[in-house]
Structure formats: structure tokens, C-alpha cells
């Protein structure tokens, strides 16, 4: 054990001597060292302590400010997102005080829900309100399951949001408007959203007093998943949209482009 520990200390000091910025090899090695071993390295080579801190992705507080709009592809793994009027931050999961025991659906769970959606129209009615009964948008959704999957995943962490579908460049896109300026998105929720978002740009923005998730389609990927769009369309057309939801759509038309 003593020999192995010595070898790892030498390897750590060798990597820390390099002047290159953060790299995966350094991080993997530093994570494999115990606190006692790291302390030994820093005791022998005090100048390496600063290098070690510089190569960390997040500050020692476990928090890092983000710029709005924020592209979710820039999200650090194992970090949550905290947005509020006071700060917009990525927060290390180990330092997060807002994560509860919420069960986040996986990408596979969301796809199963998409395939079974005709049997659960009322359960997911908020999603269908977002089409505003526009037939062409409803039919486009049959080729883009990603939008439903993202809605389904987000439904596990929030209820005070409104999806809005719109067409741009012959592709279906979605805004998700959170009717609040305070929002916590757990890291697992972000991971699952990014898993289903191939071919999409997903951005977080703040407009007026709302947080808005932009789900913008770049390319439509071929899917073998089929749903009976005629049955779904009929059910959506028969659905009553509450006046409150209709009023919100009218207000958002003055804020959001393309709708």
C-alpha cells in the first residue's frame, strides 16, 4: 500500500508540474487521491496547491455564475442550475441544498410516455395546450418526439410552466415558459434533457419576469417510433383550453418571437 501511495503521489506531482490547463487526466488522478495524499503533495510542493485549484472546474464554493442566455450544452456534469433574481449559477451537486428526492424520468421513460400518449391525453394536457389547436403543428410533432420527452422530463420538477409550440424553417420548436424568476433544475434533469436533445439547441433565457427554455430544432432525425397522429389530433381538437391559458398565450405573443 505504501509503495502504491508513493507512486500515486509521484504521478500527481508530475502532472501538476505541467503548465497545461485543465485536462481530464489530471482531474481523474486528483480525484483518486485521498485528502491525506493531496495534503502530502502540497506539503512537499506548496506551489502546486494553486495549480490544483486553478484546474478545478468549479470554485471551491461549488458554485459558478452562468451567463444568460445559457446553452445547456455548456452545463458541467454533476452540477445543478439555480436561477433567481439574485444570481444565476451552476451548483455542484455535492454543495446543492435544493435537491430533494424527486424521481427524474429517464430518456427511455420519456420515450415510453411518448408512445403511450394517446392513452394519457388528459394527463399531459398542458403539453397539448401548447399547440393552440393548430393542426399543422400537431402533425409535425409526430416526427419530433424530443419535444414531448423534454416536456415529460420537466414535468417531474415543476408545474408552473407553459409549453408553446411554433414553426420555424419547417421544423417544430418549443418554448417552455416558467412563470417564475426562481427555478432549480437538478443535474439529473439536465442530463436527461441533453440525452434526448440530439439535433436541438436548448437554451435558458430570462424574459421579463419569466424563465424561458428555448428548444430549437436544427435537424430532424429519422425515428422508427410511430403514433396514430389522426387519433391524437382528434383528441386535441376536442379538448377545451381554459380561458386562463388562452389569456397567457395572448400576453406571451408580445414577448416571444415566432408565435
UniProtKB/Swiss-Prot annotation:
A GO molecular function held by the record: zinc ion binding
Domain of life, source organism: Viruses
Post-translational modification: Phosphorylated at serine residues in the N-terminus. This phosphorylation regulates the localization within the inner nuclear membrane.
Gene Ontology cellular component list: host cell nuclear inner membrane; membrane
Signal sequence, renumbered to the chain: none
UniProt-annotated location(s): Host nucleus inner membrane
Keywords on record: Host membrane, Host nucleus, Membrane, Metal-binding, Phosphoprotein, Zinc, Zinc-finger
Main location: host cell
Keyword Ubl conjugation belongs to the record: no
Keyword Endoplasmic reticulum: no
ZnF (CCCH-type) intervals: 80-184
GO terms, biological process: viral budding from nuclear membrane
Matching Pfam families: Herpes_UL31 (PF02718)
Quaternary assembly: Forms a heterohexameric complex with NEC2. Interacts with capsid vertex specific component 2/CVC2; this interaction directs the capsid to the host inner nuclear membrane to initiate budding.
Family according to the record: Belongs to the herpesviridae NEC1 protein family.
Job description of the protein: Plays an essential role in virion nuclear egress, the first step of virion release from infected cell. Within the host nucleus, NEC1 interacts with the newly formed capsid through the vertexes and directs it to the inner nuclear membrane by associating with NEC2. Induces the budding of the capsid at the inner nuclear membrane as well as its envelopment into the perinuclear space.
UniProt-recorded name of the protein: Nuclear egress protein 1
Species of provenance: Human herpesvirus 7 (strain JI)
High-level lineage: Viruses, Duplodnaviria, Heunggongvirae, Peploviricota, Herviviricetes
Amino acid at each position: 500500500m505504501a509503495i502504491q501511495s508513493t507512486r500515486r503521489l509521484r504521478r500527481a506531482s508530475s502532472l501538476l508540474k505541467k503548465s497545461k490547463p485543465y485536462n481530464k487526466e489530471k482531474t481523474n488522478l486528483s480525484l483518486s487521491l485521498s485528502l491525506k495524499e493531496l495534503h502530502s503533495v502540497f506539503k512537499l510542493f506548496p506551489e502546486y496547491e494553486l495549480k490544483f485549484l486553478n484546474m478545478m472546474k468549479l470554485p471551491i464554493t461549488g458554485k459558478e455564475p452562468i451567463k444568460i442566455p445559457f446553452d445547456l450544452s455548456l452545463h458541467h456534469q454533476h452540477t445543478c442550475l439555480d436561477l433567481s433574481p439574485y444570481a444565476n449559477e451552476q451548483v455542484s451537486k455535492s454543495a446543492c441544498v435544493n435537491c430533494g428526492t424527486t424521481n427524474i424520468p429517464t430518456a427511455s421513460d420519456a420515450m415510453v410516455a411518448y408512445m403511450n400518449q394517446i392513452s394519457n391525453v388528459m394527463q399531459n394536457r398542458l403539453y397539448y395546450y401548447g399547440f393552440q389547436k393548430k393542426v399543422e403543428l400537431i402533425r409535425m410533432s409526430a416526427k419530433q418526439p424530443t419535444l414531448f420527452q423534454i416536456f415529460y422530463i420537466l414535468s417531474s420538477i415543476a408545474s408552473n410552466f407553459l409549453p408553446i409550440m411554433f414553426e420555424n424553417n419547417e421544423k417544430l420548436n418549443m418554448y417552455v415558459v416558467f412563470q417564475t424568476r426562481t427555478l432549480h433544475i437538478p443535474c439529473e434533469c439536465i442530463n436527461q434533457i441533453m440525452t434526448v436533445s440530439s439535433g436541438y439547441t436548448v437554451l435558458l433565457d430570462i424574459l421579463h419576469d419569466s424563465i424561458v427554455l428555448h428548444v430549437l430544432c436544427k435537424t430532424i432525425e429519422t425515428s422508427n417510433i410511430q403514433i396514430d397522429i389522426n387519433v391524437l389530433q382528434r383528441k386535441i381538437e376536442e379538448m377545451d383550453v381554459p380561458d386562463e391559458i388562452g389569456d397567457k398565450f395572448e400576453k406571451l405573443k408580445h414577448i416571444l418571437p415566432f408565435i
